[in-house]
Amino acid sequence: MPSKTASKAADTASRGNTGNFVDDYLADWDDDPFRSVSPEPAKNDKDGEKKKDILGIDKELDLKKKPRAPRVKLDETRLLSDKGIPKLRKMAPRLKLKGKGHEFSDAARLLSFYQEWLDDLFPKATFLDALAMVEKTGHKTTMRSARQKWIDELKPRAAIEEDEEDNRIHRGAVGPQQPPKVASIFETTAKAAGERAKTPTTDDLFGDDLYNATPVRNTGSTAPPQQAGGDVPDDDDLDALMAEAEAEARAQTQRPGPAPSSGSIFGNGARAVAPTTTAGPDDDDLDALMAEAEAQSLPTRAAQPVVNGSIFGNGAKKQTTQVTGDEDDDLDALMAEAEAEAEAGVQKTAQPVDPKEVGSGNARAAEKTSNLDNDDDDLDALMAEAEAEAGVGAAGGSSGDKKTSAQTETGHRTDNFDDDEKAMDEMDGLW
């Protein structure tokens, strides 16, 4: 145990060393206030750094987006790729179906075939989803055109196309084909068609009158020649008309002349040449007028049992009646006048036509035609009156004395028979 004196000695020694401690403590102090402070050494305190970064305030932010991986889609581009429908077409020959009686197994085999193809084409989707995507993509225009192209490739080639190809090859071997020869008339027609008038463009439409927009017909070859002096024809037309009139006159002079008159309005039984001009009535018109007069007189004489259908008789024996002398004279005068008019018309038609009178002949012909029509009307009226008087005389004679009728029949039978025979011969020549 240490004594008290020893402890006191230790304290005294420690007090003596106190001055050294102060000196040592103040040794680092510098009284220069302008001295630079030396930097403190950096502290590598990792634990402190971790504590400060807990909230992430001092950490730098990265605002750039990271590139995403490309999203694979089942679109028309993927279907038309090598793994798409082209691969399906190559795999199709390997699919074998058994047919009738194996429908279930064939359907399962077909579904597995498509599932294998879709798993390789688009493995991301299930089989049902992939089928729906393929169906939706198949309605696009690109897929439709591609499908139609594949269908056309499978169709057999038409015989016409093969013939055309053979002909093309043959033409290439023989040489260039020459164009077919065309007649000159068709070339002229084609040129005329190309020179037809065309509708003017919009620039010319409003530059001139609005009515000039209508195409004008090409009158170079189809329009008739225009007359220089209004209604007066030019020299070429007049020469053509004169030449035509001369040709007609020459043809009429070469024809055989009319036969001599036989003393009857019906002629001599031969068919007369029809006149070409309308200067006088021809035989056909006169025959038509006579037939019309007879047809008009038939209804009035239908109730009379003895009267014939015509004033000239029908060639059969009939019971005649006595007619007064005045009626016979009127009838003879009427027939003579008709014959004279017929002969005058024939003579006028036989005369040649003067070419200089072509222009004024139409007016005179129209005037003569109107006069002849009036004469024909008068002739029809006179003949109808004569037939009516003859019918009345026949009715009166039939109701007279039987002896008078017998005498009349025996006295005039011979003459009437001859007249009837002559009339029948003339009618045979006409009709």
From Swiss-Prot:
Q: Where is this region: Disordered?
A: 1-20, 32-51, 191-431
Bias type Basic and acidic residues, positions: 42-51, 400-416
Q: Name its cellular compartments.
A: Nucleus
Pfam families from the UniProt entry: Swi3
Q: Which UniProt keywords apply?
A: Cell cycle, DNA damage, DNA repair, DNA replication inhibitor, Meiosis, Nucleus
GO molecular function terms attached to this record? DNA binding
Q: Which GO terms describe its cellular component?
A: replication fork protection complex
Q: Which GO terms describe its biological process?
A: DNA repair; DNA replication checkpoint signaling; meiotic cell cycle; replication fork arrest; replication fork processing
**InterPro entries attached here?**
Csm3, TIPIN/Csm3/Swi3
Q: What does this protein do?
A: Forms a fork protection complex (FPC) with TOF1 and which is required for chromosome segregation during meiosis and DNA damage repair. FPC coordinates leading and lagging strand synthesis and moves with the replication fork. FPC stabilizes replication forks in a configuration that is recognized by replication checkpoint sensors.
Q: What is this protein called?
A: Chromosome segregation in meiosis protein 3
Query: What is the native source organism of this protein?
Result: Chaetomium globosum (strain ATCC 6205 / CBS 148.51 / DSM 1962 / NBRC 6347 / NRRL 1970) (Soil fungus)
State the organism's lineage: Eukaryota, Fungi, Dikarya, Ascomycota, Pezizomycotina
Q: Which gene encodes it?
A: CSM3
